[in-house]
From Swiss-Prot:
Main location (coarse class): cytoplasm
Protein purpose: Together with its co-chaperonin GroES, plays an essential role in assisting protein folding. The GroEL-GroES system forms a nano-cage that allows encapsulation of the non-native substrate proteins and provides a physical environment optimized to promote and accelerate protein folding.
Pfam family name, one: Cpn60_TCP1
Protein's UniProt name: Chaperonin GroEL
UniProt EC number: 5.6.1.7
């Protein structure tokens, strides 16, 4: 076991803060309408240009192991916020940096770290309640468009595309983002279905960077039993291999030998295949598999219908123009099922909804109906160069996630104003002692950081702007895009409540843990052994 280096107390926290600052300073330049781009070096191909905070954070690895620990912990803030809300990663990073900087000053001054953390936690809970109280529903197309526009770095075209997509497939409908072939952004709506099951092995992923599987024109096998014997699949695999097309297997499960064989064949290029678990449970699972079979033109292979897997042939397989699989979801686009059969299936589900006794059953049936009839909206991003395409696609992805978050939990005034207005909820809030009170004061000050950074990135004087915003009430705030003050909602500058809430909660959580850190342990790098001295040239004695 390699020897370890241990840092304690102020020395440990100082190293950790250096790492946090390095990462946060690189991320926070992207915040706001006048935020700057960051260029990321890639081991192959052209560098990536991005304004996406979490993309910047993910690229950062520091040489000093203790500084790197600090950077990686704050990277977790950005990643968690992106996972939960899909946006707000830069805001979360800025909040975490502000909290940690002030918190470590307080610890150095002799305050109790645990009491500081309790004060921060208490203030966070109160601020979350206030944000929910300030929130307004986001249901009309105009609000949806405004949220999409702001999250796409004030790109009105993107906001309109997202609003149009939601209008066509519904707010709960499936919307995907692809790289387009032209210079202009496009919106296509194609019949499709998404369910919440991903690939059974990451080795099925065709795109190692995004860990996704993209199958063009695949065959689709739908089975309602566990597959553990590969011999049952051999006739299908041989037929698919000869055709040169891909195969998607949807089954209750694929186990042991069968899964291992599929993975090996996929990695060797013998047959391009991906296996996913069937969605749902019990009778609902069988019904959903029948829905997918109807959509893709496949025969549902079930022993209940006197069909055995080993007797299945190519005629029983369905097809679709494209299938996208992630670790969590599978999306089937443009299934080859007959329109009459799909319409008949939809009518059966509608009849079941009318007869459903419980709200739960009705809700699940409506989900199936939406998946079968709603279709998939595809936003095709257009750009002149590949670098611009990647940067724009990241922005559209962010905007889509932010819009979904807004529909889910509502909207608040954007531009950091909601956090400033939430400060009043901390008036009169006290802890059990002075150190807890200081923790509350820390958070009160830290939540001004996003607005200060937006102003700073726009070239303004942050203290002047913050004081001006504080002196007013309601949605009054600062529009950094054109250097004006006014009602943020009327100007269309909105933030999803879920994004602001998630950023605050994750930043406070991580900052609290880091403030209470007293020791750091890292491995000591062993010195590389010296290179042996080279021998003499051929036919000559060795050098002395």
């Amino acid at each position: 076991m390699a020897a370890k280096q241990v840092l304690f107390s102020d020395e440990a926290r100082a190293k950790m803060l250096d790492g946090v600052n390095t990462l946060a300073n690189a991320v926070k330049v992207t915040l706001g309408p006048k935020g700057r781009n960051v260029v990321l070096d890639k081991s192959f191909g052209a560098p990536t240009i991005t304004k996406d905070g979490v993309s910047v954070a993910k690229e950062i690895e520091l040489e000093d192991k203790f500084e790197n620990m600090g950077a990686q912990i704050v990277k977790e803030v950005a990643s968690k916020t992106a996972d939960v809300a899909g946006d707000g990663t830069t805001t979360a990073t800025v909040l975490a940096q502000a909290l940690l900087t002030e918190g470590l000053k307080a610890v150095a001054a002799g305050m109790n770290p645990m009491d500081l953390k309790r004060g921060i936690d208490k203030a966070t809970a109160r601020l979350v309640e206030e944000l929910k109280a300030l929130s307004k529903p986001c249901s009309d197309p105009k609000s949806i468009e405004q949220v999409g526009t702001i999250s796409a770095n004030s790109d009105a075209t993107v906001g309109k595309l997202i609003a149009d997509a939601m209008a066509k497939v519904g707010k709960e409908g499936v919307i995907t983002v692809e790289e387009g072939k032209g210079f202009e952004d496009e919106l296509d709506v194609v019949e499709g279905m998404q369910f919440d099951r991903g690939y059974l092995s990451p080795y099925f992923a065709t795109n190692q960077e995004n860990m996704t599987t993209d199958l063009e024109n695949p065959y689709i096998l739908i089975v309602d039993k566990k597959i553990s014997n590969i011999r049952d699949l051999l006739p299908i695999l041989e037929g698919v291999s000869k055709s040169g097309r891909a195969l998607l297997i949807i089954a209750e499960d694929v186990e042991s030998e069968a899964l291992a064989t599929l993975v090996v064949n996929n990695m060797r290029g013998v047959v391009k295949v991906c296996a996913v678990k069937a969605p749902g449970f019990g009778d609902r699972r069988k019904a959903m598999l029948e829905d997918i079979a109807t959509l893709t033109g496949a025969t549902f292979v079930s022993e209940d219908l006197s069909m055995k897997l080993e007797e299945t042939n190519m005629e029983h397989l369905g097809t679709a123009s494209r299938v996208l699989v992630t670790k969590d979801n599978t999306t089937i686009i443009d299934g080859a099922g007959e329109k009459e059969a799909i319409a008949k299936r939809i009518n059966v589900i509608k009849a079941n909804i009318a007869e459903a006794n419980s709200d739960y059953d009705r809700e699940k049936l409506q989900e199936r109906l939406a998946k079968l009839s709603g279709g998939v909206a595809v936003i095709k991003v257009g750009a002149v160069t590949e670098a611009e395409m990647k940067e724009k696609k990241d922005r559209v992805d962010d905007a889509l996630h932010a819009t979904r978050a807004a529909v889910e939990e509502g909207i608040v005034a954007g531009g950091g104003v909601a956090l400033i207005r939430a400060q009043k909820a901390l008036d009169g809030l006290t802890g059990e002692n002075d150190d807890q009170n200081h923790g509350i004061a820390l958070l009160r000050k830290a939540i001004e950081a996003p607005l200060r950074q937006i102003v700073s990135n726009a070239g303004g004087e942050s203290s002047v702007v913050v004081n001006q915003v504080k002196a007013n009430q309601g949605n009054y705030g600062y529009n950094a895009a054109n250097d004006t003050y006014g009602d943020m909602v009327e100007m269309g500058i909105l933030d999803p409540t879920k994004v602001t809430r998630s950023a605050l909660q994750h930043a406070a959580s991580i900052a609290g843990l880091m403030i209470t850190t007293e020791a750091m342990i890292g491995e000591i790098k062993e010195a590389a052994p010296a290179m042996p001295m080279g021998g003499g040239m051929g036919g000559m004695p060795g050098m002395i």
